[in-house]
Swiss-Prot record:
Its main location: mitochondrion. GO terms for molecular function: lipid binding. It comes from Chaetomium globosum (strain ATCC 6205 / CBS 148.51 / DSM 1962 / NBRC 6347 / NRRL 1970). InterPro entries: Mdm12 (IPR027532), SMP_LBD (IPR031468). The SMP-LTD domain is a barrel-like domain that can bind various types of glycerophospholipids in its interior and mediate their transfer between two adjacent bilayers. GO terms for cellular component: endoplasmic reticulum membrane; ERMES complex. GO terms for biological process: mitochondrial genome maintenance; mitochondrion-endoplasmic reticulum membrane tethering; phospholipid transport; protein insertion into mitochondrial outer membrane. Component of the ERMES/MDM complex, which serves as a molecular tether to connect the endoplasmic reticulum (ER) and mitochondria. Components of this complex are involved in the control of mitochondrial shape and protein biogenesis, and function in nonvesicular lipid trafficking between the ER and mitochondria. MDM12 is required for the interaction of the ER-resident membrane protein MMM1 and the outer mitochondrial membrane-resident beta-barrel protein MDM10. Residues 270-285 have a biased composition (Polar residues). It is found in: Mitochondrion outer membrane; Endoplasmic reticulum membrane. This is Mitochondrial distribution and morphology protein 12. Residues 130-139, 401-415 have a biased composition (Gly residues). Residues 246-257, 387-400, 416-428 have a biased composition (Low complexity). Component of the ER-mitochondria encounter structure (ERMES) or MDM complex, composed of MMM1, MDM10, MDM12 and MDM34. A MMM1 homodimer associates with one molecule of MDM12 on each side in a pairwise head-to-tail manner, and the SMP-LTD domains of MMM1 and MDM12 generate a continuous hydrophobic tunnel for phospholipid trafficking.
Amino acid sequence: MSIDLNWETVTGGPDGQELADQIRDFIHTKFQSVPLPRFIKSVTVHDFQFGVIPPELELKDITDPLPDFYEDHVDSDVASDDSEGEEDAVDNNLAPPSQGERHQRTDDSEALGGDVRNLGHLPPHLMFGSPGGPGGPGMGSLRNGDMGSPFMRVSTPGIPGGTSNLHYFHSHLGGGLSGTQTPLAAVAGAQHLSTANWLEGHGHSSSVPNLTHFGNPGGAGTSPRRQPERNHSRNPSQGSISVADLNPNSLAPPSSSTLGVPSLKEKHSTTPAPGSATALSGSNEQQQQQQPQDNDDGHPRWREQRIDDMQAVFRIRYAGDVKLLLTADILLDYPMPSFVGIPVRLSITGLTFDGVGVLAKIRKRVHFCFLSPEDAAAAVGGDGEEGLSSPGEGPSQAQGQGQGQGQGQGQGQTPGAGQQKQQKKQAGWVGSGNTKLGGLLQEIRVESEIGQRESGRQSLKNVGKVERFVLEQVRRIFEEEFVYPSFWTFLV
C-alpha cells in the first residue's frame, strides 16, 4: 500500500528549517569525532537542505514492535514514565518517599509535638538534658535521616548567662566518669576544653546528670528521667549546632575538622517538597536506591508489552535532490610537511536510497530505524528481489540485471551510458540467485570546487581522496546511527 507524503509540510516552514539545522549540527558533530587522514586538517559542515523531491513510501506489514524497543534505558533522558504516579517524580527529578519514611516522620512529629511547645520554659541545661528535649531521645539521638527533617527549623532558645558555667557544671558533677563531655558541652565550653580531649571520650558511652533540683515551670518537683547509656554517633546533636551558631565568638558553623564529624549542609529556611527527600536522609536513601540499580547493570530493564503497541514496516525509495555542503582543509606538504591548508568545498547534490524502515509506536514513544540488508530481505519476504530495483524500474528488470552480473555480462543489454549508470548503482550488490541489498545508500553525487582546473582535472591530486573519504564517512554515519540495532526514539 503506497502512502502519499506531503513533503512540503514536513520540510517547510520554521519547523522544517529547525529540523534541517539539527541534522546539519548532528553531522558536523560526528565529523569532529572521526579520525582524519594525514592530508586533511579539518572538516566543517555548513548547510543541509531536504530538497523538493519526496521519498516513495510503501506499507509492507504491521507487526508487533521489535524486542529492543522495549528496553528501558534508566540513564537516558527518556526514562520510563509508564505509570501515572511516576511521571511527576521523573519531571521533578526526585524520588518519592517510601511508606516507612513517611511513617517515621509522623512518629517524630508526634514525639516532638508536646515537648517543643514547652522548651522555652525550661532552663537551657535542663532543656538539652531532658528526655524530650534536643538532648534526649526525641532530638539528641537523631538518626541521619532526621537531621534534615523540617523540624530542624525549630529555633533553639539562646543560652543566657554564657556557656562556660554549663561546662563547669558538667565537668564537676560528672567527676571522672568518661563520656560526660557531651557534644553540647564540648562546643559550649570549647574555651575550657580542648577538642582533642573531647574527641578521646567521644566514642564512649554517655549519661545525663540527674538534675533533681530543677523543677517544672509549674513548681512540681518531678525529676526528669535518666537517660540510658548509649554510644555517641559521629553526628552532633541539634543543640550543639545551634549553640555554635549562637556563639558570638564564632561567625561560622563548626567545621568537620573541629568537631570530628562529617560536614553538614547549611540549614535553609525553605520547606522541602512533600515528595522530596531531605538533605541528609536523601543521601542515604539514594545509596540504597542506587545499590539495586548498580547490581542490575548487567541485566537491562524491560517495559511491559501492551496490546495497543504496534509497528509498521515500510519500503522507502528515494532518488532526490537532498543537499549537504561542507568544506575540508587539504594540507600541502610542499615545501615542508603540512605547510599550508587549502579549503575544498564539497557539495552532496543528491543520493539514491532503497531500503526498509521500521516505525514503532509504544505508548508515548515512537521508535524509528532502517533494517540491515539481511533483516530487510526477511521483512519484505517475497519482495526481496523487488527490493533490488532502483526507483523507476520494475522487479523483472532488476532480476535480469542481477542474473546478468552473476554470469559476467548481461545478455540482451547494450553496453552504454545507461548500463554503466545502472552498474554504478549496483556496485555493492551481490549478483546471485540469493541476491540481497549490499548498502542502503546506493549512490551519492558529489561536486567539488578548488583552485583552477587544468585540462578538465583538478590541480591537486588529493581532491579525489577527500571525496572518497567524505563519502565513506557519510555512509558510515548513516549505517551506525540509523540501521538496526541502532534506532531513534521520539517522545509524542
